[in-house]
Structure formats: C-alpha cells, structure tokens
Amino acid sequence: MTSKKKLCYALLFMSSFSFGQSSSDQLKELINSALERDGQYQQQNLELQYVDIDQKRLTDTFLPKVELTGRVGYMDTRINYTSPEFGIPRVPPLFPGMMVPSQNNTLGISGFSGVSKLQASVVLYSGGKVGHLKKALNEKKLSQQELLSSSKNEVITSIAKIYDQFALVHQSKKVLDESKKRLEINRKTAEKALGYGLITPYDFKKIELAQVTLDTKMVEYEGKRELLITQLHILTGMDKKRIAEIEPDLQVLNYVVEDKSIENRPEIKALNHGIAAAEYKIKAEKTWWIPKVQLSTSLSYFGLYGDHIQTSNDVVPYLVKKLDIHTKPLSLFPMFNAGIGFKWSLFDGNTGKREAEKSKIDKMVLENKKADAQRKLQLNLANNQTNYDIALAQIELKDKARKIAKNALDQVEKEFRYGVKKSMDLIDAENDLEKAELEYKTAVFNQRRAAIELMKSTQNLDVEKF
C-alpha cells in the first residue's frame, strides 16, 4: 500500500469517527454534559448523599458504644473532730484508773489517686422507633430521586430546545443558500434581458437589492448560529469548535399517547413517597411510651499512691500517739459490672404526642399538594395534546403553502425569461417561497417542541425518539 493510500484511509477513518454520530447520539452527549454542569441537578445529587448518611446513622444506633475514661489527681483532705472525755475504771491492784480528757484534733489525708473506666453499651430494642424512621428515610430518598428525575427532564427539554434551534438555523441557512442560487441564476437572466431591452435598469436594480437583502439575512444567520454555539458551550462545557461541527437534522417528531395517566410523573411519585414517609414518621413518634432496652458493661480501676495520713495531736491522749503514716500503694482492680437496663417514659410532657400531630399536618399538606398537582398536570396533558394536534395540522398546511409557492416561483421564472413578468414579480415570488420554506421549518420546530412537552406530560421522554 502506498503512502498516499494510507493517508486517504486514515483521513477517511478520522472523518467517520468525527461525524459518524447520529443526531440522537449527539443530543445525548450534549445532555449528559449539561447534567454534569447543571447546578440544581448536582445540588439534588448532593442532598441524596445526606439521606444516605442519615440512613447509616440510624443503622449505627444498634452498634456498641465503647468509652474509656480516666482521671489522675491529687487529694488533700482535712477532718476536724473533738474526741470525748472518758474514764478508764481502775483494776486493783493492777491499774488505779484514769480520766482521758477531751481534745480537739485534725486528721489529714493527702496523696495521689487514679481512676479509669472502660464502658460499653448497646441498644437492644428502641421501641420500634428506629425501624419506622429507617422506612421514612427510605421513602424520603425515593422522593428525592423522583425530584432528581424531574430536574433531569428539565435539562433534557432545555438542551433539546437549543439543539432544535440550532437545527432550525442550520436548515434556514440551506433555504437562504437555495434562494441565493436562484437569485444568481435570475440575475444572469436579467442581465441578458436588460441587454435586449426587455427590462428597465430599475427592474435590474430590484434584483440587485434582493441579493443585498439576502446577504443581510446571511449575516443575521451567522449571529444567531454563534449565539446558539455559545449557549451550548456554556451549558455543556463542550468545545465551541466541536459544537460548530454538529449538523443537526430537523425532522417531524411523531408521538402517540398510549397511556394518558399522569401518575408516572416524577412530581406525583415524589409526593407519594413523601406521604409514605410522613406516615412512618407518625408511627415513629407514637412509640415514645414503649420501653427502650440497653445492655451495658464496665471494667473499672481505682488506685491510691503516696498517701500520707497524719493527725495534729494524739489520737487518744496518753494512749495513742498522733499519726504520721506513709502508706503503700493501694489499688482496686478489676471492678466488673454487666447488666441489662431499660428506660420507660411514662409521661414525656406530651412531647411525643405533639410531634405526631405535626407529622400528621405534614402528611395533610403533602396530600393537598398532590391533589393540586394532579389537577394541574391533567390540565397540562390536555393542553399539550391540543398543542401537538395543532402543530401537526400546521405542518401539513405549511407544507402545502411551500409547494404552492414553489410552483408559483417556477411559473414566474418562466414568464420572466419571456419578458411577460417584471423583476418585482420575480422577487415577490422568491420572497414568498423563502418565507414559506422558513415557516415550514419553524412549524417543524414548533411541532417537535409540542411533541417533547407531550412526552414529558406522561413521563415518556426518550432521547432515542428525538
């Protein structure tokens, strides 16, 4: 294989890789990129992580809690006391007896002490509250996932609209290019007719003016195209050059509503899960009076070091001298304790009752929102169905109009060549066709908008169908 052939194959491969994507693939890539950059969508994703953490915290309720505490300190205690006066009877002839006088004394104890404790506890039964709260959180998570789906629908709709606007501008360019070609051909015909005296210079200038007007529309087209490229760049983060290479197609989007139920709408599903979460919350609050059971155990240590025990006077006058003792270290270990305890709230000051009442009101609020949403979404479905039917009818009418305009232009061009029609008639016919073509493209754009809104009405958005 020669170098030239290798180069040709390489260029062919690169071209097919760059432009081989279908319109559906291009749109999906734009939507996925937009979802990664959409602030509200990402915020809701983060809020879902909060719920995950709350679920883990509830599960952790039944995990053991282990604590190790310790304390080392210096102790210095003084006890003031007065010993009573008492007598010792005599024991003849061994002991003559004696009186022991009353005496004020101070007992002092000083030294270092150390205490440590290892304690473990685990909840065995929460009264059913944790179980109900876990179910409530699960429903809350499902509700937020539905709201996330709703935000995704909005991003899809927004990007699809800009994509179709991009396609409409692209199709408009083709219409303008066709008009430019026809005007150039008719201009050459007009030059010959002017040379033969079949038309006046004024008629010829009219054709030149039409060409300038068309060039102005071309400039407007470039401005609109650049604006749409910038919009897609900001929303998706994709490179402008890559977006500029997209050549979207604008085709009629047919859709038939098979199921007219709105119950699959994420807004309704989110409210259903919210109502279920409120029900579990009510059940959880009603468990306030059920006893909670906990298992606990501990291992403790107590020690005395460098203790000094002393008195200011004799402990017993004449009999027991004053104390001045330095003791050896004293320790108590192990001190082990284990058992099962319970907590039974016989009356909590109506706290649990009031919380249950609040949860009931929350449930009623959600039920009212659901009823209101159902009415509005049902009306929205009917409105979108009507708009879709009108949009389809508009396409049929606009298609007939452009065919009539095309036939009229063909007839005027023939008559212009034979000098029967003036240049103004030709320009009017050209403008009529251009307008009819653009109105047809706009009708297709509007029909696609109506079809996508109708899909969204019953939660049947499918990018593959776009």
Regions found by a protein language model. Name each.
Residues 3, 29, 53-55, 154-269, ...:
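Periplasmic alpha-helical coiled-coil/stalk elements that build and connect Gram-negative outer-membrane
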Residues 21, 37, 67, 71-109, ...:
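Primarily recognizes Gram-negative and organellar outer-membrane beta-barrels
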Residues 42-46, 59, 110, 124-152, ...:
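Sec/SRP-type N-terminal targeting helices
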Residues 73-77, 125-127, 300-304, 347-349, ...:
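Structural signature of outer-membrane beta-barrel domains
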